[in-house]
Every structure is written in structure tokens, then in C-alpha cells.
């Protein structure tokens, strides 16, 4: 599987985050469920909707590899599904209590801000 991106809503098509750029994202994370026809979304394990947008720096190791690579493919305002195998997520360690070792994950991600450029 590796990393796959499926666009749900197009962004502005011109502003893409680069390594070192701070970004703000809304997201919901799900365990991968092959039997679910809705983008293989399994059990929800986390969401920024309860805490507010996640702030991270692309390429700085702030987030999992699948996000570092997947979010760089997005443009400002885009909403996408990022589906990733375990090596792009939490790997052999998983995230105890939430994510099993080597688990594939599905994230619904919305890119709200790049550096100082936000949605109007």
C-alpha cells in the first residue's frame, strides 16, 4: 500500500507546503478496515476536532512519515484522505492503547494554513 492520497475537496492549487514550513491541519484518524467501503475507515482513534487544529512543521519529524509526505502533495484548503501502511505510520511500535503494531491507518486531513497563509 505505501502511501495513497485521495482528494475530497480541491485546494487553491498553487500553495503547497515545503519542508520546514509550519502548517495547521484538521484531521481525524482511523484504523484501516478493508471491509468498509467508506475509504476503509475503521475505528476512529483521534481527531483534532476536539482540541483544535494541529500545528506542525513539515519535514521536521513533528508528524509521522505519511503526513510529512502526504501533506506536501496537498494545496492550501484541500481536504484529502491519506491511507498509509504501517511503515508510513507508527511502525512496529504502534501507539500503545490506540494503534496496534504495523497497523495501516486512514486519515481525513484538511490543510488550513501554510506559514502565514490561511484560508480567506
Swiss-Prot record:
SUPFAM superfamilies: FKBP-like. Disulfide bonds: none annotated. This is FK506-binding protein 1B. PPIases accelerate the folding of proteins. It catalyzes the cis-trans isomerization of proline imidic peptide bonds in oligopeptides. PANTHER family: FK506-BINDING PROTEIN 59-RELATED, PEPTIDYL-PROLYL CIS-TRANS ISOMERASE. Pfam families: FKBP_C. Inhibited by both FK506 and rapamycin. GO terms for cellular component: cytoplasm. It comes from the Eukaryota. Residues 20-115 form the PPIase FKBP-type domain. Its EC number is 5.2.1.8. Residues 1-26 are annotated as: Disordered. It catalyses: [protein]-peptidylproline (omega=180) = [protein]-peptidylproline (omega=0).
Amino acid at each position: 500500500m505505501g502511501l495513497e492520497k485521495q482528494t475530497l475537496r480541491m485546494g487553491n492549487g498553487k500553495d503547497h507546503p515545503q519542508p520546514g514550513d509550519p502548517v495547521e491541519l484538521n484531521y481525524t484518524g482511523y484504523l484501516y478496515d478493508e471491509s468498509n467501503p467508506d475509504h476503509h475507515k475503521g475505528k476512529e482513534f483521534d481527531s483534532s476536532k476536539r482540541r483544535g487544529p494541529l500545528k506542525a512543521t513539515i519535514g521536521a519529524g513533528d508528524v509521522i512519515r505519511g503526513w510529512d509526505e502526504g501533506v506536501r502533495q496537498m494545496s492550501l484548503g484541500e481536504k484529502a484522505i491519506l491511507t498509509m501502511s504501517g511503515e508510513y505510520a507508527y511502525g512496529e511500535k504502534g501507539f500503545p492503547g490506540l494503534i496496534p503494531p504495523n497497523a495501516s491507518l486512514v486519515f481525513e486531513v484538511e490543510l488550513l494554513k501554510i506559514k502565514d497563509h490561511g484560508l480567506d
